[in-house]
Structure formats: C-alpha cells, structure tokens
C-alpha cells in the first residue's frame, strides 16, 4: 500500500508561508521522466544497453541547462546503480554530473534482497532526503524540507507521501531514436519551476496550483496557462499575507 501524507505535512502545505531563503532542491527521476529506455525484451543486459543509449525527452538539453543554473539538483531513481550511471553519462555532461548534490538509486530504497532484484513497487521517501542531505550545490549548509524541495517524476504512486512536492509529468514513451513523439512537458516544467523558484513554500503552491498540461493545446497556450496559475497564486498570497 502506498504511503500517505502525514497530518503535519498536510498542515504545512496549507499555508503560503515557509522557508526563509529562496534556495530550492530539484530531485530528478530518470526513466519515463527525462528519457525512455526502449526495450523489446527485458533482461539485465538489455536494460543496461538501453540505459547506455536512452531516448531523451524533447527539450532535455535546455531543461538540464536551466535547472543546474538555478537550483541544487539530485537524482533519485529506482533503477540499479550501474544503470543509473549509464543513463547519467548518456544525458548529462561531466560538469552536470559533478554538480549533483546526491545520486540515489535502488540501493537507497530500503529494499530486501528479494525486492531489489525484482520489479516491485517502490516509493521515494523525501523524509529520508531531508534527514540525510544538508548542503546545497555550493556546499553551504541548508535545511531541505517540504518548503523548498521539488521532485520531478512520472509516478504519482512513488511520490504518494509528499504529493505537494511533486511535479507530476506524463510517462515518456518512445519506440526509437527516429520515432520520438512531440512532447512539450519539459518546456512547461521549466516555466513552472521559474514560478516556484522564489516562493517560500512550494508545497502550498503545488497543492493549490498543481502542474498540468492542457491536452491538444500549443506550447504557447500551456505557458500562458501556467503564467495564469502564478498570477492566481500571487493574488491568494496577498490575501493570506496582507501588506502593512
């Protein structure tokens, strides 16, 4: 059964107020979020080969360039360590890989040996991230929390304990490098992150104004929609926190 948000978490997500500085942590999933591993047959060897040569989601280069320039970044993947390293080498340059403040894999999910080697449902516990990681991309101390942490992932179930820190993107599926579907999600995530960058409580923002792609609408229309969400957020926070 998927974990549920704690009462404390839900309470803290209900207020516009939160962190005292603007530093934010972006946690990245890999497969299905930033890339696709096209597999005809699933085996240890085929998964590794697909990890070495994944199909990048459209807009990935610009997305990575933006987040590394503006946020502290870590990876949290349910894949095995050697596959995670293969995917990172395929999509990130050396500077970006070195800039990661952490890279968590299946090893960090507290699985039994039986579970580790099988395709079982896994969960990404952000409480563990907040307990163990206490520095930003420059090495300075910071208290990461629900106020300043954003996870970009295609699985709502894996992020069920912290739904209002989750930018839920659709599962990216592509058949081959020559057959990549049109996809605007990462471009839209950049716009959403630009709005989240300076808010004091990202969990309030995501709770009240969750990320959403308008189906069958253009990139321009979707960016306009996300800007309208931000305007609505600003109006609500002015009501919650009237200026003297």
From Swiss-Prot:
For the FCP1 homology domain, which residue ranges apply?
19-196
> Which residues fall in a coiled-coil region?
none
GO cellular component assignments: cytosol; nucleolus; nucleus
Q: Which domain of life is it from?
A: Eukaryota
- Please provide, alphabetically and separated by semicolons, the GO molecular function terms listed in this UniProt record: phosphoprotein phosphatase activity
Q: Show the SMART domains listed in the entry.
A: CPDc
Which GO BP terms apply?
signaling
Under PANTHER family, the record lists: DULLARD PROTEIN PHOSPHATASE (PTHR12210)
Q: What is this protein called?
A: Uncharacterized FCP1 homology domain-containing protein C1271.03c
| Species name | Schizosaccharomyces pombe (strain 972 / ATCC 24843) (Fission yeast)
């Amino acid at each position: 059964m998927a974990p549920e948000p704690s009462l404390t978490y839900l309470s803290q997500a209900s207020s516009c107020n939160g962190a005292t500085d603007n530093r934010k942590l972006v946690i990245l999933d890999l497969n299905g979020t930033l890339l696709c591993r096209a597999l005809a047959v699933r085996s240890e060897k085929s998964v590794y080969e697909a990890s070495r040569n994944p199909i990048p989601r459209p807009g990935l280069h610009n997305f990575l360039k933006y987040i590394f320039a503006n946020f502290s970044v870590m990876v949290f993947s349910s894949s095995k360590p050697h596959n995670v390293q293969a995917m990172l080498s395929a999509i990130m340059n050396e500077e970006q890989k070195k800039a990661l403040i952490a890279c968590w894999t299946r090893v960090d999910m507290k699985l039994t040996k039986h579970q580790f080697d099988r395709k079982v449902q896994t969960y990404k516990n952000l409480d563990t991230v907040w307990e163990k990681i206490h520095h930003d991309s420059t090495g300075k101390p910071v208290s990461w929390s629900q106020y300043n942490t954003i996870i970009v992932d295609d699985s709502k179930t894996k992020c069920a304990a912290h739904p209002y820190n989750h930018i839920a993107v659709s599962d990216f599926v592509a058949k081959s490098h020559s057959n990549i579907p049109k996809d605007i999600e990462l471009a839209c995530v950049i716009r959403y992150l630009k709005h989240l960058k300076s808010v004091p409580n990202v969990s309030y923002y995501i709770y009240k104004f969750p990320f959403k792609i308008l189906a069958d609408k253009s990139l321009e229309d979707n960016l306009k929609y996300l800007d309208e969400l931000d305007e609505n957020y600003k109006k609500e926070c002015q009501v919650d926190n009237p200026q003297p």
